[in-house]
Amino acid sequence: MTYEIQASVREAQGTGASRRLRREGQIPGILYGEGQEPVAIAVDHKTVFYALEKESFHTALIKLSLNGETKDVIVRDFQMHPFRREVQHIDFQAVKADQLVRIRVPLHIVNAENSQAVKLQGGRVSLLNTAVEVLALPANIPAFLDLDCAEVVAGDILHLSDIKLPEGVESVSLKRNENLAVATVTGKKR
């Protein structure tokens, strides 16, 4: 899914200026990367707030329109208000199509309900890490990674090497020879 966001350069900075922006339905943000100086921007709160609720937005390649120019960006960070449903600030990183990007991708458990551990041993699969840091070209960044648990039994520990990575995607930890545990399987051993 592709996302398009309109942004404008903001001149006024600081706490007071940021509060005024938020009252006007805007979010203060920053755009950095691509060897350029960071640019203070403002984006529409409603557009970003509802997009952030979608898991795919966090790893998607976003088209950011700024001063009539469109840039490919990814969400690098964002801050939420402690108790209101409100985005306080957002950081975008400009990316080039031919340069690798390091990003955290969500991890999903699949086929756990069909495994011996769950069906016969009354167990369950628990994630130790909800996301995996990967290295990929912007066009190859997956929305999520699947951890297939069809063959697991109680007592198993699943590692990064058990995740099938799509073509053109590498695990940062596996490149450093760190095969970290990502999930455990609990239940009665038979």
From Swiss-Prot:
Part of the 50S ribosomal subunit; part of the 5S rRNA/L5/L18/L25 subcomplex. Contacts the 5S rRNA. Binds to the 5S rRNA independently of L5 and L18. This is Large ribosomal subunit protein bL25. Keywords: Ribonucleoprotein, Ribosomal protein, RNA-binding, rRNA-binding. One of its GO terms (biological process) is translation. PANTHER family: RIBOSOMAL PROTEIN L25/GLN-TRNA SYNTHETASE, ANTI-CODON-BINDING DOMAIN-CONTAINING PROTEIN, RIBOSOMAL PROTEIN L25_GLN-TRNA SYNTHETASE, ANTI-CODON-BINDING DOMAIN-CONTAINING PROTEIN. This is one of the proteins that binds to the 5S RNA in the ribosome where it forms part of the central protuberance. The keyword Cytoplasm does not apply. One of its GO terms (molecular function) is structural constituent of ribosome. Belongs to the bacterial ribosomal protein bL25 family. CTC subfamily. It comes from the Bacteria. Disulfide bonds: none annotated. The lineage of its organism: Bacteria, Pseudomonadati, Pseudomonadota, Betaproteobacteria, Neisseriales. Signal peptide: none annotated. The keyword Glycosyltransferase does not apply. GO terms for cellular component: cytosolic large ribosomal subunit.
